């Protein structure tokens, strides 16, 4: 499930997401794998899980302070990937 964590982080950089929004945005991820990734990332302190007292229940996942501190690293990785993709497309 680790290959999904970077994609989850990429989404959470933009805004908080609900579980089904994340699942639909990550083509090919199973519900179990997404659940496991989110739990692991929450346990590691990278994301937060907020449950709202609403009917139906609403749960949102967002970057924690630790997760936010990873923003420059993730952005650098994204830039590298885009540059690499561009260079390999030219060859």
Predicted regions and their residues:
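Glycine-centered, phosphate/nucleic-acid-interacting loop/turn motifs that mediate DNA/RNA or nucleotide
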Residues: 45
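N-terminal helix-turn-helix DNA-binding core of bacterial DNA-binding proteins
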Residues: 2-33, 54-60
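Basic, amphipathic "hinge/linker" alpha-helix immediately C-terminal to the N-terminal HTH DNA-binding motif
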Residues: 53-77
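Basic amphipathic alpha-helical segments that dock to polyanions
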Residues: 34, 38-41
